[in-house]
Amino acid sequence: MSTNEGSLWGGRFADGPSDALAALSKSTHFDWALAPYDIKASKAHARVLHRAGLLTDEQRDGLLAGLDSLGSDVADGSFEPLPTDEDVHGALERGLIDRVGPDLGGRLRAGRSRNDQVATLFRMWLRDAVRRVADGCLEVVNALAVQAAAHPTAIMPGKTHLQAAQPILLAHHLLAHAHPLLRDVDRLADFDDRTAVSPYGSGALAGSSLGLDPDAIAEDLGFASAADNSVDATASRDFAAEAAFVFAQIGVDLSRLAEDIILWSSTEFGYVTLHDAWSTGSSIMPQKKNPDIAELARGKSGRLIGNLTGLLATLKAQPLAYNRDLQEDKEPVFDSVAQLELLLPAMAGLVGTLTFDEERMAELAPAGYTLATDIAEWLVRQGVPFRIAHEAAGAAVKVAEGRGVGLDALTDDEFASINPALTPDVREVLTVEGSVNARNARGGTAPTQVAKQLGVVRKAMEELRIRLS
């Protein structure tokens, strides 16, 4: 049997828990990450107890000094949980009692439960974590923006269904990857607004009868307000699920960028060369330069999605209020943050060091008859109904395919035989430069519009940094 040493309960039990139960209940191997937040919250709790008349000045000061000492020892690693400690809360109470004695150290637990305590600490940890993740996302966005600025007129094949579609600017494509990541950071900023609500003072579920001030401790801990419902505050983990969703969405957005890089770096595409420092080789094939960062981004996106799915499954059938199932809420979120903190700097470095082959992309831009839409839209500008224009452009592609040439190689007579409206003037749109320049509406791929898009991305980056600072 376990001795139950290091637990915060046991008075009504005749004996300690079984060894198997103690092993199952133990959470210090992951919740120790909350230790700095636990100490900070304990200091705020001591001040609230003092204001409520439950601690003398001397007792408050003694607890604060003991917590300062304990915090320093936690920070430098000289105080760590013991195998007998059930969780971070019990370990830290043991450490505090070692420093200030059982009479004074035992007073701190008044008016709080592990239920409101851990709900608060998890929110505090996440509010810091999302800022780190947001910073990492913005570094990837910045790398995309820098590459876009370095290639303002480079033209590449735009694709749908992974088939040649229309010519676009490389910068346009790169910025298309920046926008989803900016939305992810915007979601993280919104998430912080909803998470800045403190459960402290909710007790186990019903609130406190000791005259404590939840708003005071909320302000002390940097929250915008205290919770309005103590049952909801202790039992709800929608904030964790929301964070896990945004982390998974970031993974998905990075995976799509990674997939492009993997394709572009292949011999068949040949758009980019990977920097040596951001790629790996093969143990048997000496010629290989592998896009491992991009491949790991694809792989880790599945892990992030799994963390979200697992957390939602844990939360889906719990009656109010707190249940021990919620011990399982932290590991998937902690893991998602850890994976993104590994992945985001690597993706920023990979993107920032890509070398693009502009000639190769320009050579492939008209392949696959990507200017067919330009013929159809040119006819529309001449007054031809789009249905007829679409058919005529398709017929031009069929003739060119039959001859094994590009659209620009068709003769004037061939164009005229397809549709009399296809005069020699149609050749003004039969260049990739003309096609790109013509798409000058907001959001389009014309250089003037892409330059504006780059400005929008840079402005959004700065605004988001300010929101999250």
Swiss-Prot record:
Q: Which gene encodes it?
A: argH
Any one Gene Ontology MF annotation carried by this entry is: argininosuccinate lyase activity
Annotated localization:
Cytoplasm
| Protein family per UniProt | Belongs to the lyase 1 family. Argininosuccinate lyase subfamily.
> Keywords assigned by UniProt?
Amino-acid biosynthesis, Arginine biosynthesis, Cytoplasm, Lyase
InterPro entries per UniProt: Arg_succ_lyase_C, Argininosuccinate_lyase, Fumarase/histidase_N, Fumarate_lyase_CS, Fumarate_lyase_fam, Fumarate_lyase_N, L-Aspartase-like
What's the top EC group for this one?
lyase
* Superkingdom per UniProt: Bacteria
Q: Could you identify this protein by its name?
A: Argininosuccinate lyase
Q: What is its EC number?
A: 4.3.2.1
* Pathway noted in the entry: Amino-acid biosynthesis; L-arginine biosynthesis; L-arginine from L-ornithine and carbamoyl phosphate: step 3/3
Give an example GO cellular component term for this record.
Answer: cytosol
Catalyzed reactions: 2-(N(omega)-L-arginino)succinate = fumarate + L-arginine
Please give the biological process terms from Gene Ontology that the record holds. Answer: arginine biosynthetic process via ornithine; L-arginine biosynthetic process
